[in-house]
Amino acid sequence: MEKLKPKLFSVMKSYTKEQFVKDVIAGIIVAIIALPLSIALALASGVTPEKGIYTAITAGFVISFLGGSRVQIAGPTAAFATIVAGIVAKNGMDGLIIATLLAGVILILMGFLRLGNLIKFIPYTITTGFTSGIAVTIFIGQIKDFMGLTIVSEEPLIETMDKLKAVFQFISTTNLQALLVGVISLLILIVWQYLPGFCKKIPPSLIAVLVGSAMVALLNMNVNTIGDLYEISNKLPTISLPSFSLKTVQNVLPDAFTIAILAAIESLLSCVVADSMVNSRHRSNMELIAQGAGNITSALFGGIPATGAIARTAANVKNGGRTPIAGMVHSVTLLLILVVLMPYAALIPMPTIAAILFMVAYNMCDWRKFVGLCKTAPKSDIIVLVTTFVLTVVFDLVVAIEVGILLAAILFMKRMSDVTEVEGWKYVDDEDDADSLSLRVVPHNTMVYEVSGPLFFGAADKILKITLDEKMNCLVLRMRSVSAIDATAMHNLEQLYTDCKKKNIQIILSHVGEQPMHIMEKSGFLDKVGRENVCAHIDDALERAARLG
């Protein structure tokens, strides 16, 4: 069983000074990368910029300290932006803090209950669908700032479709100076990564922030900056408790579950990616506990939800980080930056922030995979993918995940039902199968039905479609291909037994698997049928039928 022990405690046994130096360098570089991203993601989430830094500092440190991965870097991520903005708009900061606290508790419970491996049962089409949907909502949400639009609205625009409608409605208010800053910032973000040599060591988002801020300040451009719209604080984060009310808890509980699921999916996915880069193996349940503790800490210090960030984790590895020390250094570095440089964040133009978030959205939305799935996946998977994507954009992430999982479950059961068969004996020529049906002689007045596939509630009705001929006195059910049965299937078997009993037909079971045998034993079905009528092999079952006939 996987140990609930932080990776930090394991790696410190063989820690060296050389690795410490590498971890410190990697941590500082990742902090520089995380700074503009944390600010941008905080603004996209509808909160003040320093709250993104608070999150990276508090949650980042705790998750690195307690986490189940050697190199995970945690902080605010784009996946949470839309849901956080919705919570803040509807329930205020107190609602967000309560939702994040509840999500943290849920994550810790998931870890202690060792549910880390259950995340794999969330279909790839759902994660791809909502990730692409989030990317589109972020993109639409940033058009206003990128173009410098002046949107007049009586109420805050929360829904993505309302924001898109407002963009078209107020497109005539485009600020050309803001658009110029946005386009130049976006070009820097795109081109910088292709420049040779030392340029690749400097995060393009940092260059975009410096160039955009310099343009607006030196050219005295009429462009909104962070300082024009938000009051920025460089104060250290302090513990603050929200005003709890039962109504608020009820309102944000669905959001808390969504945050917990998102945090679990994204953090464990990041761990898997990191494992392949450093040839290590993460502890998924310990990682969930750390994610929970990190989110609780972030909420108490005024931050927003956090999870493992794949891009920052990859940057950590590429720059030499190999232990959780790098993640902790990243948080300490951001703390120093908060105190010293945060006032200068007021100079960052909003179009530059929008450009950074455009790139975040583009990197999130792997459209090649999306299109590839639409071309190659089964129809049922395409339905789940497109439905989750559309619901994320049109409604919100909570609805998308709930409906997506429900739809995926229903379609999965439909697929399983389709492969489950209950059919009469067919004589086929199959020389390769020593168990071939064609090699058996069926006794007179005996029916043989082969049951294939799992017998669960979606397919259990096929048992009742067996035609009972009153001229027969034995019904052999060959169950060698039945891997599992559930309560509904067991109920239908009981009904079949009752129908057979009325017509004086004896049921004989052949080759019953371990799980079905256990269920039949517990339900008393074996005693009803008669244990002497439960045979290990089809030959034994046919011989038994011949004796009864």
Residue ranges of model-derived segments:
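Transmembrane helical cores of multi-pass ion-transport proteins
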Residues: 1-426
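Short, contiguous clusters of charged residues that form electrostatic/catalytic patches at enzyme active sites
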Residues: 26, 186, 190, 461, ...
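Active-site-adjacent beta-strand anchor residues
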Residues: 74, 509-510, 535
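The feature marks cytosolic C-terminal regulatory regions of anion transporters and related permeases
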Residues: 363-528, 546-549
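Short acidic-hydrophobic, aromatic-tinged amphipathic segments that line or gate anion-handling sites
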Residues: 528-544
